[in-house]
Amino acid sequence: MLDIQQLRNDLDNVVARLSSRGFAFDINAFIALENERKTVQTRTQDLQAKRNATSKQIGIAKSRGEDVASIMAEVAGLGAQLKEGEERLAAIQAELQQLLLSVPNLPHESVPVGKSEEDNVEVRRVGTPRRFDFDVKDHTDIGTPLGLDFDTGAKLAGARFTLMRGQIARLHRALAQFMLDTQTEQHGYTECYTPYIVNADSLRGTGQLPKFEADLFAAQKGGQEGESNEAFYLIPTSEVTLTNTVRDEIVPLDSLPIKLTAHTPCFRSEAGSYGRDTRGMIRQHQFDKVEMVQITHPERSYDALEEMVGHAEHVLQALGLPYRVVLLCTGDMGFGAAKTYDLEVWLPAQNTYREISSVSNCEAFQARRLQARFRNENGKPELLHTLNGSGLAVGRTLVAVLENNQQADGSVVVPEVLRPYMGGLTVISAQQ
């Protein structure tokens, strides 16, 4: 959430920066609410001062033996007006809060201005795509004989769900374990096991609610506990749970940075993706991801962003997968991000790079919603900065391994770093 003081003091600049990411801020609604807030606040303060002064007259009149009935009636009337003003002021503040909850983050000055992914800027490419001397298959055709079962997934749950069996299920698990071990043992993250179901407050804190409720899977408790109708949701990413660990907390300065990671399933309705990537595992309602979260001092968050990109790259390099790093433009960034890098892996069957990780600095945008703070050198509470990124999306990494490591006979070479997790297997094939 944006700082309302920044809107009050620098409205034109904020509106222009929001416009650069394709967001039209409702200036008229904001100004109308602000003008009413100022009017009501001034009137309320005047009423409070008048009531205090009038209340003092009661004591003076009583000491003189005078009748105080009229003064007490006036105080009561002022009290009623004051209550009415305070209630209206609270309602205005709530309306301003709702308005701000729908406003995205301001892009950092280093983010290129653009409208769509076509305006993103390639930063670097790493690795050379392999030249094949046979007809390349996509991951669906490679994976089906190896235990990738889309038909049973659809029978169990519907479209965009997958069942895995045997060695391909083991390879999927090996990828997740390798990613977790890399992030914890080499990059200093603390592994967490988190709930897969969260309340609405958690999703508001990280920015999924209220704007993106259609992208979520809602859940409800059964039995007597379900009678409260409290809203619960399946997590779209463990960014939600990991970042919310500091909600309503003031953390010690010497505990920063806080570096957390988790391997969880992620659940997304893909409401805006009808008809896109309907074949295979690229866009699923349920997929696994190893998430990285850093919670940092504001002065260090952009160093942390570059560091986290490197942590995600390390996994791709260890697996021997060609990829590129892309700096997203203002119009292609996620709602809460001030700056985002995407890592895109090479998929031979599509003859293109596809996103496999997104790493973002949200600055204080989430922390303001979460009231996540630290005590600075002067002992004063100050908002933290939060960052998140995939380290990596497990299903898409499996897709990349299948396609890049495929052999002419339909088998797949297991990346060397995964072989200890695969019982020493060097190849998986249908014959196994």
Swiss-Prot record:
Its main location: cytoplasm. Gene3D superfamilies: Bira Bifunctional Protein, Domain 2, Serine-tRNA synthetase, tRNA binding domain. One of its GO terms (biological process) is seryl-tRNA aminoacylation. Transmembrane segments: none annotated. ATP binds at residues 268-270, 355-358. It catalyses: tRNA(Ser) + L-serine + ATP = L-seryl-tRNA(Ser) + AMP + diphosphate + H(+); tRNA(Sec) + L-serine + ATP = L-seryl-tRNA(Sec) + AMP + diphosphate + H(+). Homodimer. The tRNA molecule binds across the dimer. Consists of two distinct domains, a catalytic core and a N-terminal extension that is involved in tRNA binding. Belongs to the class-II aminoacyl-tRNA synthetase family. Type-1 seryl-tRNA synthetase subfamily. This is Serine--tRNA ligase. The lineage of its organism: Bacteria, Pseudomonadati, Pseudomonadota, Betaproteobacteria, Nitrosomonadales.
